[in-house]
């Protein structure tokens, strides 16, 4: 075990929070629940930088100084990273995340432009997955209006919920006393319907200029995973969730008129099934 694993004292809990930026549970923001959380800022997400994401951590000892070097473990991929005296665990993790994301370079582009500071080292043969400054700037601007975007999504979801009550459908619960969703997707399941019947709804909606989606097709149904020997018959719950799911449009560019148009047509088409 590394010193970090020993400090945590158990299996580290990592949260895939790709869709959850802005969500909370029992009063805690999603990034404050697990030890590590990863967020996606892809172009289709609520909060976007066009491409990219973020890794956050929430460690009770994060502000404590690292007493021993994390990298003394020979099996640790970071065994070549030098120790910095007086560094906290948060600072240590941030530094290592930077190294992982930019080919293991120990200086960023700005640091190399300082007078006489051209030289740098490659500490490890790692990855190229850093967010550019340009797209980060998009995120900083969007952050200023994100609260309003979440509120708009909540109102749209409330309207969908009310309008679809008469239908034989189940929708994802976005809000209750214990949790607040980011309102990323509006998922609807057409009870008692097959995938083929649900696809007909998608086609008819498309004929009326309304783009819907499916979230998600199970991996065992994908060609690459079939080649690996996966069979959807072994995953009945995944197929059950997929077989009659349809995702309705939900974005802050939609006007109230757009929303009503989607509702009117969806209710009509589903009622005729």
Write out the residue ranges for each language-model feature.
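Hydrophobic framework residues that shape the active-site pocket
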Residues: 41
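PLP-dependent aminotransferase class I/II
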Residues: 1-6, 24, 60-61, 72-273
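Acidic active-site catalytic centers that drive phospho-/nucleotidyl reactions
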Residues: 15-16, 35, 133, 249
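Catalytic PLP-binding core of fold-type I/II PLP enzymes
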Residues: 1-27
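Conserved beta-strand->loop/alpha-helix structural units within folded catalytic cores of enzymes
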Residues: 47-48, 259
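Glycine-rich phosphate-binding loop of ATP-grasp-fold ATP-dependent ligases
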Residues: 49-54
């Amino acid at each position: 075990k590394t010193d970090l694993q020993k400090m945590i004292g158990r299996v580290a809990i990592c949260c895939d929070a790709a869709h959850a930026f802005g969500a909370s549970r029992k009063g805690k923001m999603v990034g404050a629940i697990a030890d590590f959380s990863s967020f996606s800022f892809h172009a289709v997400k609520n909060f976007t930088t066009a491409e990219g994401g973020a890794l956050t951590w929430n460690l009770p000892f994060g502000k404590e100084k690292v007493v021993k070097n994390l990298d003394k473990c020979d099996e640790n991929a970071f065994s070549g990273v030098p120790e910095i005296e007086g560094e906290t665990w948060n600072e240590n993790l941030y530094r290592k995340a930077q190294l992982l994301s930019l080919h293991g370079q120990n200086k960023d582009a700005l640091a190399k432009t300082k007078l006489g500071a051209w030289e740098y080292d490659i500490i490890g043969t790692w990855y190229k997955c850093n967010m550019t400054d340009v797209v980060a700037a998009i995120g900083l601007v969007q952050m200023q209006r994100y609260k309003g975007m979440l509120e708009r999504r909540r109102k749209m979801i409330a309207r969908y919920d009310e309008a679809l009550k008469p239908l034989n459908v189940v929708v994802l619960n976005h809000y209750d006393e214990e949790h607040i969703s980011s309102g990323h997707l509006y998922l609807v399941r057409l009870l008692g319907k097959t995938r083929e019947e649900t696809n007909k709804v998608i086609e008819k909606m498309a004929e009326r200029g309304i783009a819907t989606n499916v979230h998600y097709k199970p991996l065992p149904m994908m060609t690459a995973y079939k080649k690996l020997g996966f069979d959807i018959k072994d995953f009945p719950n995944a197929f059950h969730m997929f077989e009659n799911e349809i995702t309705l449009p939900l974005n802050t560019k939609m006007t109230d008129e757009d929303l009503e148009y989607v509702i009117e047509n969806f209710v009509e088409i589903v009622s005729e099934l």
